[in-house]
Swiss-Prot record:
Segments traversing the membrane: none
The keyword Cytoplasm is annotated on this UniProt entry: yes
UniProt GO MF annotations: nickel cation binding
Name of this chain's protein: Urease accessory protein UreF
Subunit structure: UreD, UreF and UreG form a complex that acts as a GTP-hydrolysis-dependent molecular chaperone, activating the urease apoprotein by helping to assemble the nickel containing metallocenter of UreC. The UreE protein probably delivers the nickel.
Coiled coil: none
PANTHER family on file: UREASE ACCESSORY PROTEIN F
Length: 229
């Protein structure tokens, strides 16, 4: 059971104030707005829910695997899976997004001296680290429960998508909060699915999201944009 210290650590990691630059990315949502795939509250909620399904199929179960390897000191396995995840990002801006956010969180872990020397040294030795790998390292360093940690990861992703929708569509603040509240159950389902996939032998990781890849590629040359992805 998560105690007060662990809960505080989770709230810290999931906070929009975490200095990783998440606010500057929309992960294709802005391109979806540009082509009118997302145009109002209902379509924004549907888009985010579909994106959460994609997250539950790859990034969230990978987070659980990375967390376990960080805790066990299997740093070679962490590096191998991290390289695989980066290779699955289909566009340049998606690769830059996860690399920049991972670098920023890695730097914060070093500055805050989270975790033991071995974990921080392994992170420092990485030429590049993706965001799920860095977030899993931070969660392991702060000794949070893995299920709670991946829940925080998924919720933070949903919250960032909601904030992007409020700016890009645009939507009112109340609409954004309705979207966020309406996706509470979807976050819980995503955690269940991620846990199931991570427990399979071999793990069931699926990166199939052709629509996201196409929209992200379009966004790279979009005439006017607010976000970096």
């Amino acid at each position: 059971m998560t105690n007060a210290a662990q809960l505080t650590a989770l709230l810290h990691l999931a906070s929009p104030a975490l200095p990783v630059g998440a606010f500057s990315y929309s992960q294709g949502l802005e391109a979806a707005v540009d082509v009118r795939r997302v145009a109002d509250e209902a379509s924004a909620a549907a888009w985010i829910a579909e994106g959460l399904d994609v997250l539950a199929a790859c990034e969230a179960p990978l987070w659980l695997l990375q967390f376990a390897d960080w805790q066990a000191g299997r740093f070679d396995a962490v590096a191998e899976r991290d390289a695989w995840f980066l290779a699955t990002r289909e566009t340049r801006e998606l690769r830059l997004e996860t690399s920049q956010m991972g670098w920023s969180l890695n730097r914060l872990i070093q500055q805050m001296a989270w975790g033991d020397d071995a974990l921080r040294s392994a992170l420092a030795a990485c030429a590049s680290v993706t965001f799920p790998t860095a977030f899993a390292a931070a969660a392991a360093a702060l000794n949070v429960d893995p299920r709670d940690g991946v829940t925080a990861y998924c919720f933070a992703w949903v919250e960032n998508q909601m904030a992007a929708a409020v700016k890009a569509v645009p939507l009112g603040q109340a609409a954004g909060q309705r979207i966020l509240f309406g996706l509470h159950a979807a976050v819980a389902r995503a955690v269940e699915e991620a846990t199931r996939r991570a427990a399979c032998h071999p793990p069931e990781l699926s990166t199939f999201s052709p629509g996201l890849g196409v929209l992200s590629a379009r966004h790279e040359t979009q005439y006017s944009r607010l976000f970096r992805s």
